[in-house]
Amino acid sequence: MATSNHSSGAEFILAGLTQRPELQLPLFLLFLGIYVVTVVGNLGMIFLIALSSQLYPPVYYFLSHLSFIDLCYSSVITPKMLVNFVPEENIISFLECITQLYFFLIFVIAEGYLLTAMEYDRYVAICRPLLYNIVMSHRVCSIMMAVVYSLGFLWATVHTTRMSVLSFCRSHTVSHYFCDILPLLTLSCSSTHINEILLFIIGGVNTLATTLAVLISYAFIFSSILGIHSTEGQSKAFGTCSSHLLAVGIFFGSITFMYFKPPSSTTMEKEKVSSVFYITIIPMLNPLIYSLRNKDVKNALKKMTRGRQSS
């Protein structure tokens, strides 16, 4: 590899998920199956919400965007990972590497803010039900989504711009199965101090601040739910929040474990395994989490299925 990333011929080798040849085929089949389920599940959710007249409230508007984002950031990583199970050397150009990192960051950061926006929607629905249609109007929801995507583009641009000016001359092997920030920083022979500061600040805002906002919202939500006198009302309110709380916990828990831990607390091999969870498993689980416990989604799916059978 060239001693600097400014050469058009600069290349990296992705170490991959495992170095054991006997696991290549089983892992390929496993992640291919997961990716197929992810694509079918998220595309199905998007089309179901778009075509069903029942799924018009703002929560489903946000859910369709969540499915889109899950589909996108999974597609940025998983196809390349599947291809890399085949050749012996998993070569990726510097431009392809930076592009992969850029789009991955856009969608992962956007998902964090989107989950926070969805939490605000639940807060208004439960704590301010009489004002819900006014506060969560279509215009407000559209503005919120514009902010979500804008923040994703902004922070991803900051990270990748700083990454693109680094020189990589120590090694050409990335100890990961995709181009993530931390493995790339370890390969740089120029100062990464600014990159590390940006990672800490931006990561703190994107993860810790949004997590805190979610926790505060849920404190108000649970307080309002406990004030409901009927058991049926409490059960229904808890049901509307449980799916989102599970999705939020899995996503932010995985991200926090990956990027906000002591450097020596785990090996790179363990980091690969944990990153698989939020890159491939979470996008597959989200449509299931939101549909299995949601009567409106299940009823809309049944209605659409019956309509096709009758036609």
UniProtKB/Swiss-Prot annotation:
<dbReference type="InterPro" id="IPR000725">
    <property type="entry name" value="Olfact_rcpt"/>
</dbReference>
<comment type="similarity">
    <text>Belongs to the G-protein coupled receptor 1 family.</text>
</comment>
<keyword id="KW-0812">Transmembrane</keyword>
<keyword id="KW-0716">Sensory transduction</keyword>
<feature type="topological domain" description="Extracellular">
    <location>
        <begin position="259"/>
        <end position="271"/>
    </location>
</feature>
<feature type="transmembrane region" description="Helical; Name=6">
    <location>
        <begin position="238"/>
        <end position="258"/>
    </location>
</feature>
<comment type="function">
    <text>Odorant receptor (Potential). May be involved in taste perception.</text>
</comment>
<dbReference type="GO" id="GO:0004930">
    <property type="term" value="F:G protein-coupled receptor activity"/>
</dbReference>
<feature type="transmembrane region" description="Helical; Name=7">
    <location>
        <begin position="272"/>
        <end position="292"/>
    </location>
</feature>
<feature type="topological domain" description="Extracellular">
    <location>
        <begin position="1"/>
        <end position="25"/>
    </location>
</feature>
<dbReference type="GO" id="GO:0007186">
    <property type="term" value="P:G protein-coupled receptor signaling pathway"/>
</dbReference>
<feature type="topological domain" description="Cytoplasmic">
    <location>
        <begin position="218"/>
        <end position="237"/>
    </location>
</feature>
<feature type="transmembrane region" description="Helical; Name=4">
    <location>
        <begin position="140"/>
        <end position="160"/>
    </location>
</feature>
<keyword id="KW-0472">Membrane</keyword>
<dbReference type="GO" id="GO:0005549">
    <property type="term" value="F:odorant binding"/>
</dbReference>
<feature type="topological domain" description="Extracellular">
    <location>
        <begin position="161"/>
        <end position="197"/>
    </location>
</feature>
<keyword id="KW-0675">Receptor</keyword>
<dbReference type="InterPro" id="IPR000276">
    <property type="entry name" value="GPCR_Rhodpsn"/>
</dbReference>
<feature type="transmembrane region" description="Helical; Name=3">
    <location>
        <begin position="100"/>
        <end position="120"/>
    </location>
</feature>
<feature type="transmembrane region" description="Helical; Name=1">
    <location>
        <begin position="26"/>
        <end position="46"/>
    </location>
</feature>
<dbReference type="GO" id="GO:0005886">
    <property type="term" value="C:plasma membrane"/>
</dbReference>
<dbReference type="GO" id="GO:0004984">
    <property type="term" value="F:olfactory receptor activity"/>
</dbReference>
<keyword id="KW-1003">Cell membrane</keyword>
<dbReference type="InterPro" id="IPR017452">
    <property type="entry name" value="GPCR_Rhodpsn_7TM"/>
</dbReference>
<keyword id="KW-0297">G-protein coupled receptor</keyword>
<protein>
    <recommendedName>
        <fullName>Olfactory receptor 8D2</fullName>
    </recommendedName>
</protein>
<feature type="glycosylation site" description="N-linked (GlcNAc...) asparagine">
    <location>
        <position position="5"/>
    </location>
</feature>
<feature type="topological domain" description="Cytoplasmic">
    <location>
        <begin position="121"/>
        <end position="139"/>
    </location>
</feature>
<dbReference type="Pfam" id="PF13853">
    <property type="entry name" value="7tm_4"/>
</dbReference>
<keyword id="KW-1015">Disulfide bond</keyword>
<feature type="transmembrane region" description="Helical; Name=2">
    <location>
        <begin position="55"/>
        <end position="75"/>
    </location>
</feature>
<feature type="topological domain" description="Cytoplasmic">
    <location>
        <begin position="47"/>
        <end position="54"/>
    </location>
</feature>
<feature type="topological domain" description="Cytoplasmic">
    <location>
        <begin position="293"/>
        <end position="311"/>
    </location>
</feature>
<keyword id="KW-0325">Glycoprotein</keyword>
<keyword id="KW-0807">Transducer</keyword>
<dbReference type="GO" id="GO:0007608">
    <property type="term" value="P:sensory perception of smell"/>
</dbReference>
<keyword id="KW-1133">Transmembrane helix</keyword>
<feature type="topological domain" description="Extracellular">
    <location>
        <begin position="76"/>
        <end position="99"/>
    </location>
</feature>
<keyword id="KW-0552">Olfaction</keyword>
<feature type="transmembrane region" description="Helical; Name=5">
    <location>
        <begin position="198"/>
        <end position="217"/>
    </location>
</feature>
<feature type="disulfide bond">
    <location>
        <begin position="97"/>
        <end position="189"/>
    </location>
</feature>
